[in-house]
Amino acid sequence: ISRYILEEHMNTGTLVRQRGSDCLDIRFGLYDYHGGLQCGETLDVKISGKWVPTRIEMGEDWYLVGIDVDDLIGLIVRI
């Protein structure tokens, strides 16, 4: 399957903290969430107008492999 075909079926949303926990989630709409992110899960993040493939991991806090930002909350992602 080509990357182009896969991109057509990806959902775009915003990284948010899950209410009442330290877990991260993706919000797609007012009441539409991914359901929580797990270590090792792959996603794309929009940086300077371009989609960059990465994966989410947990050290002292959540981070995206190869992405150097101070705060993940509010980043536009697709999965």
Question: Where do the model's predicted regions map?
Answer:
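Residues that act as N-cap/strand-start positions at coil-to-secondary-structure junctions
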Residues: 9, 37-39, 50, 71
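Sequence-level detector for tyrosine residue identity
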Residues: 4, 31-33, 63
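Hydrophobic beta-strand residues in large extracellular and virion-surface proteins
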Residues: 15, 43-45, 77
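Short, compact, well-ordered microdomains
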Residues: 50-79
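Short coil-to-beta transition motif at edge beta-strands of beta-rich domains
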Residues: 34-46
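Mixed-charge, Lys/Arg-rich low-complexity intrinsically disordered regions
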Residues: 8-34
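Generic beta-strand structural signal
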Residues: 17-19, 46, 57-58
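Short, Lys/Arg-enriched N-terminal segments with co-localized hydrophobic residues
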Residues: 1-9
